[in-house]
Amino acid sequence: MAHWRAVYAQGGGHALAASLREETSGRVRAEEGEPLSDADVRALLHGATAVKTYPDLRAARSMDDVLHDGRCALLYLTTSDTEGHWTGILRTPRGIEYFDSYGHAPDEPLTWLSPQKAMALHEGQRDLTRLLHDASARGEPVSYNKHAFQALRNRNMATCGRHVACRLMCNDMTLPEYADMLASTGMNADEFVTRVTDAELARMKRKA
């Protein structure tokens, strides 16, 4: 269990907030605009998840080809072949959950692209929709969050990867339980995920 999860389990939201603020004092605002790299996402999840770009889904025949240990961090390419919008996919006893920090439905980020841009980035088909429909047809419930955890109005906010990493680190929680945990800290969600990911990455660096 990650250190911050242990703090929350033992002391609740207020204890977690105090611990995170002590560990990450003074640098959160700047880093809310600093996106995580795929290496950061892999490190935060200790390699126990798949990390894919959207074009990787083209070859997938089912969600079994997408998920690793029931999790996948999925990068929609919206800017270049290495940059875009992070989302998460979880398989739990309750079914498959798609997590977008903006609260968008699966494949909504594809609508941000012109047809020409989509083809250039090899995102001309709705492959995730295809795979989720297949899972649903096989009897596996599929859901997605409709709540925006990430600030929508701030164009400088680049916390989607941080949101996805935190949600995937809490794949044992239901989405309402996860939302309740965030709310219990008294922080807005962008501040929370920035402090958590900064603290975890710094802790890993110290141990290296």
Role assignments for model-derived ranges:
Residues 74-169:
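Cysteine protease-like catalytic core of ubiquitin/ubiquitin-like
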